[in-house]
């Protein structure tokens, strides 16, 4: 462009530089970082949960294995202890054994302790006598018990078998009825014989007011493994 004096004037417009949106870039960066942190946190939580589940499963497994070993050890210990007790009985020197969970003068067999007492008592008195020792009158519910008791006493002894009336069924103290063919039951047809005693492998009904010796039974505890010979 030429001015009045003949000089050429250049009209140059300076371009303004584009402004960078600092706020927008900063916001995007924080979002990325927040997403990364969220993913890391979720991953840590999932990892901790998985670790916790694995830890519980491992503990349960080890506990189960330990219980199985303990149960197996107890079974072996029980059998061996009862073998030792039986041998002492066969030798006629029965004094019990330290491995037995039963008290002195109680016999250890199966899962129970058996007490043979020479006290002349009525059936009700015998029942109370056993109760006072945290036991019950003997219940015979399998053939092994029949043979075990038969081999260890030849005396008349009360057991926990009775009935309310002569026309009612015989029941054990826990309310269960006698099993068929478990033992020979000698019924003589006389009325009011509502209590039973055991003698030489057979069950006999008799009057509850009669006085006889008795047999008590209670659950055995754990075999004392550390006392085995």
Curated annotation (Swiss-Prot):
Membrane topology term: Single-pass type II membrane protein
Motif interval(s): ITAM: 7-10
Modification comment: Glycosylated. Phosphorylated on tyrosine residue in response to rhodocytin binding.
Glycosylation sites recorded in the entry for this protein: 68, 120, 134
Consequence of substituting residue 192 to A: Significant reduction in rhodocytin binding
Cellular localization per UniProt: Membrane
Cysteine pairings via disulfide bonds: 102-113, 130-216, 195-208
Subunit structure: Homodimer. Interacts (via cytoplasmic domain) with RACK1; promotes CLEC1B ubiquitination and proteasome-mediated degradation. Interacts (dimer) with SYK (via SH2 domains). Interacts with PDPN; the interaction is independent of CLEC1B glycosylation and activates CLEC1B.
Protein name: C-type lectin domain family 1 member B
């Amino acid at each position: 462009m030429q001015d009045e004096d003949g000089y050429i004037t250049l009209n140059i417009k300076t371009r303004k530089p584009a402004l960078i949106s600092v706020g927008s870039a900063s916001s995007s960066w924080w979002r990325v970082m927040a997403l990364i942190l969220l993913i890391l946190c979720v991953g840590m939580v999932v990892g901790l949960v998985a670790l916790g589940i694995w830890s519980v499963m491992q503990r349960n497994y080890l506990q189960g294995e330990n219980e199985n070993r303990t149960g197996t050890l107890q079974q072996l210990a029980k059998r061996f202890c009862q073998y030792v007790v039986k041998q002492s009985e066969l030798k006629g020197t029965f004094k019990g054994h330290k491995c037995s969970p039963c008290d002195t003068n109680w016999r250890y067999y199966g899962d129970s302790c058996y007490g043979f007492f020479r006290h002349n008592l009525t059936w009700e008195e015998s029942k109370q006598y056993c109760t006072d020792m945290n036991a019950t009158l003997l219940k015979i519910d399998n053939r092994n018990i029949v043979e075990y008791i038969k081999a260890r006493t030849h005396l008349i002894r009360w057991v926990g078998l009775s009935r309310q009336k002569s026309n009612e069924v015989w029941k054990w103290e826990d309310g269960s009825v006698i099993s068929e063919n478990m033992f020979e039951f000698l019924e003589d047809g006389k009325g009011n014989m509502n209590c039973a005693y055991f003698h030489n492998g057979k069950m006999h009904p008799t009057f509850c007011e009669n006085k006889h010796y008795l047999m008590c039974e209670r659950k055995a505890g754990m075999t004392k493994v550390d006392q085995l010979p």
